[in-house]
From Swiss-Prot:
Single GO MF annotation: structural constituent of ribosome
Quaternary structure and interacting proteins, as annotated: Part of the 50S ribosomal subunit. Forms a cluster with proteins L14 and L19.
Top-rank taxon: Bacteria
Protein name: Large ribosomal subunit protein uL3
GO biological process: translation
Similarity-based family: Belongs to the universal ribosomal protein uL3 family.
Amino acid sequence: MDGLVGRKLGMTRIINEEGIMIAVTMIEILPHYVTQVKNKEKDGYCAVQVTTGNTRDKCLNKPKLGHLKKLGINYGKGLWEFRLNDSNRLISVGDIFTLKVLKCINKVDVTGISKGKGFAGAVKRWNFRTQDASHGNSLSHRAPGSIGQNQTPGKVFKGKKMAGHLGYEKATIQNLAVINIDIKNNLLLVKGAIPGVIGENVIVKRSVKIGYFKEMSSI
């Protein structure tokens, strides 16, 4: 398993050995308890289901509560799944995964729910250019312009970039450098910013593009 669930604690800065100041994000990753192992014969795919953190039983619905109580595992904040290869047959229910899973990884991808910014215009939401400041333009400086064609096709195509709700959607930041792993305090420090507000749950996985970049650099 090369992915873990963490909680965004916020940002800070550290000074490396060369004296360069680096902005980092602190992610708290508590121990993960395996609650179910799925296989291809029974479930159609291979995956491991985990829970982490602590919560009160009244915060869980009946199916999750019964599932965890049956296994005798502490009530976590939720259930998450991570895909496995067919070769990962040694994982069983009750196993514990910690930050040591990421110890030999230099780059990670972090997935979370981005900050919600409410209703936004096309300039802010899609980086449209503004219209002329003068030359006859009046009250349309930040308007998007035409959204269609003529009688043919006579409609607005789906996916047209227009004003609307900005943020609060799934976002992934790729190839973030791992600055430090503090196993004692369950902290992971990554370079740069990650999606979400402070306290948001995020998924930390091994970077999927780092191998590709290494291949390209050797050509």
